[in-house]
A protein has these predicted regions:
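Inter-motif core of Ras-like GTPase G domains
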Residues: 58-76, 83-96
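Conserved ATPase-coupling elements of RecA-like P-loop NTPase cores
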Residues: 5, 56-62, 79-82, 104-108
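Canonical P-loop GTPase G-domain recognition
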Residues: 101-150
Length: 150
């Protein structure tokens, strides 16, 4: 909903808009292009798209993004690369979030990383915790380095 966009804007001070997807399970490059007409893109330094849906549908559609980042959370399980290979194959960066909860779940970080890299040897896999901030500096560094390459 537009509530999510407003929440992001309120918490970060960053302009945020909702892309209307007409009830589909994804956004695509055409939807993004139309949404960008609402933005002053001349002064835009970085655009982050949050696709919707699950680990299947969004992986099948090109959003027009330069890089794809996905989040896998520890509670979801280390088997997700086996169940949803395409999402991991098309991701440049895989963030394994909620790393601060590892002791409470049967999640093998190294096994998950191995499974991801088997599907996509070029992927970067980083452990993060949105709650504690662990690993977020590495994420920011990765984003900034990739941005410089454009």
């Amino acid at each position: 909903t537009s509530l999510d966009a407003q929440r992001v804007a309120d918490l970060t001070g960053v302009e945020s808009i909702q892309i209307h997807n007409c009830g589909l399970c994804h956004i695509d490059a055409d939807m993004v292009s139309r949404a960008l007409l609402e933005y002053d893109t001349e002064n835009l330094d970085l655009l982050i798209l949050e696709n919707i849906g699950n680990l299947v549908c969004p992986a099948e559609f090109d959003t027009g993004a330069h890089k794809n980042v996905m989040l896998l959370s520890v509670p979801e399980g280390d088997d997700k690369p086996l169940k949803y290979p395409l999402m991991f194959q098309v991701s440049d960066l895989v963030l394994i979030n909620k790393i601060d909860t590892l002791e409470y779940f049967d999640f093998d970080f190294e096994l998950a990383k191995e499974r991801i890299l088997k599907l996509n040897p070029n992927a970067v896999v980083l452990p993060v915790s949105a709650k504690t901030g662990e690993g977020l500096e590495q994420v920011i560094d990765w984003i900034m380095k990739e941005r410089e390459k454009l």
